[in-house]
Amino acid sequence: VEGFTPSKSMRRTLRRNSNIIASQKQAFATEEQYSLFKVYEQARHPDGEMASMDFNDYRSMVEDTPVETFIIEFREGSGRLVAVALTDQLSDGLSGVYKFYTPERAVLSPGTFVILWHIERAISLGLPFFYLGYWIAQSPKMAYKARFMPLEILTETGWNKLRSERSV
């Protein structure tokens, strides 16, 4: 998180989502979260394996973990759940395992907002890193991760800094 400066569009995303309230919860799956998860998967990844997950599969993803894991729920002021992030607590940072959100809010960049929230949270906790999670550089659906500079990737030679989005 050191050296990260949000871009103009990221600052706009923070402003547009300023009504969203985040709360950290134990890694416990709820029907409300699962309902949002299903809507998200059907809208964003209908051909993916996760789209066919039932509640027990979702519960396993959330609760069966060998590390300290928690859920961040993001709600509108009315209390409506609009995004969820499954997050691992590591000794040196936070790791974004998976996030999902209400598809009709896509115009407000909820995925970016959730990442920015985690970066701010890592900074407030004095943690040096926020791990964006698994990344396939050739996947258009994962291309957004390259916007969060400075960025490091783990390769067979260790951690390597990327100098720009173009070096991906």
Task: List each model region and its residues.
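Active-site/acyl-donor-binding loops of N-acyltransferases
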Residues: 1-3, 129-168
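A conserved beta-strand-loop-helix scaffold within acyl/acetyltransferase catalytic domains
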Residues: 1-107, 147
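Residue-level preference for non-acidic, small/hydrophobic
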Residues: 37, 115-118, 145
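Active-site scaffold segments
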Residues: 88, 116, 133
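Nucleic-acid nuclease catalytic cores
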Residues: 94, 102-108, 127-130, 134-138
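Conserved acetyl-CoA-binding loop-helix of GNAT-fold acetyltransferases
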Residues: 107-119
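Conserved acyl-CoA
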Residues: 116-128
